[in-house]
Each structure stands twice: as structure tokens, then as C-alpha cells.
């Protein structure tokens, strides 16, 4: 067994933690958070119903996550986020909009997927604007790597989808290459897909578009 620590795709940059975010984090996480366990999570039990389950990896400040959950009450959503300000922000939005179909797991995505989700247990996975780690020496930190994609594919049901969005051209090319190398995945487009109606434009995205940045949506489905 290797003694080297795992390479993480994120750095815990705490950033500004507002009073409102801190209050939401401390008071609402026990209600809407799901603790890390070594047992598979039972979504039917958590949400009190049987519905399509969508996992979002890296929910950021949570605006997009909350909006998608608000617009799709027929689906259940699990957000994975490790940064406390973002967790607090999303918790506040869950409370504000009274979202009964959204919960948070505040832990590392790889560990969560390995321990808490079984094979063919998810209907969809969203990864919007993952850190591109643009410097070549940091490419090994990129979240989208063959072993992780294999894990994602395993956790999806046949017919389930993986949706990744990025504004970094080099990373988009890398993502396409990695996903095409997974034989259980098939692209829903030739290369990049049109932005689905369910993914709202973020403020970050709108600013980027004004600067001429191209947003690329990549959507693959599991075939078997």
C-alpha cells in the first residue's frame, strides 16, 4: 500500500465567511447535511420518497444547485462541497426556498462516492466549472481523470448521465479525451452539447461570456 497521501483536486481556501453563512452552517447543517459514513446512503429514506437521484460535485456558493432543485421538485439532489462559506450559502438557500429535495454532504467527493454510493445508484451527476488547474505541473490535480471517471460511470445507472461544464478550453479537450476513453460512456453530441435548459447561467458565466469566454457543456450517458 502506498504511503503517499491522495492527490486532491481542491485546496481548502477558506475565503470570506460571512456571519450569515456561518450562522447557516452552524444551525442548518445538522438538519440538511448528511454525515460521511462507510455505509451506502439510502436516498429513499433521506427524502421520504422514491425519485431520480442527482449528485452535484462542487456546488460552489450554491446558487445554481438551489435553482436547479427549485425548478425540478420531482428529482432529489445531493450536493458535495468542502468549502465552509459555500456550504453555509447553500444551506441558507435551502432554508429560504424551503427545498425538501436537496441535501449536502460536506466531504471529499472521491471518498463519498467510494463509501456512500453503490454501483448503478444515481440517475445523473453534475460537475459545473471544476478547478481547471491550468499550470501543466498541476494537471495531476484535475478532478477529471480516468480512474475517477470510471468511478463516476460505475455509480450511474445505465441510461444515467454525466454533465460537466467548463470555460477552460484546454480542460474541455482533456475532459472529452478522458470520457471518450471510458467504454461505458457515449457522447450525446459530436463534441460539445448545447447548454440544457435545466442549467441556469451563473453570474460567473455571464461575466465570462461578456469577456468572450466560451462555455462548453459536455454530456455523456452510460450505455451499460
Curated annotation (Swiss-Prot):
The keyword Methyltransferase applies. It catalyses: guanosine(46) in tRNA + S-adenosyl-L-methionine = N(7)-methylguanosine(46) in tRNA + S-adenosyl-L-homocysteine. Its EC number is 2.1.1.33. Keywords: Methyltransferase, S-adenosyl-L-methionine, Transferase, tRNA processing. The active site is at 131. Transmembrane segments: none annotated. S-adenosyl-L-methionine binds at residues 56, 81, 108, 131. SUPFAM superfamilies: S-adenosyl-L-methionine-dependent methyltransferases. Catalyzes the formation of N(7)-methylguanine at position 46 (m7G46) in tRNA. Belongs to the class I-like SAM-binding methyltransferase superfamily. TrmB family. NCBIfam families: tRNA (guanosine(46)-N7)-methyltransferase TrmB. This is tRNA (guanine-N(7)-)-methyltransferase.
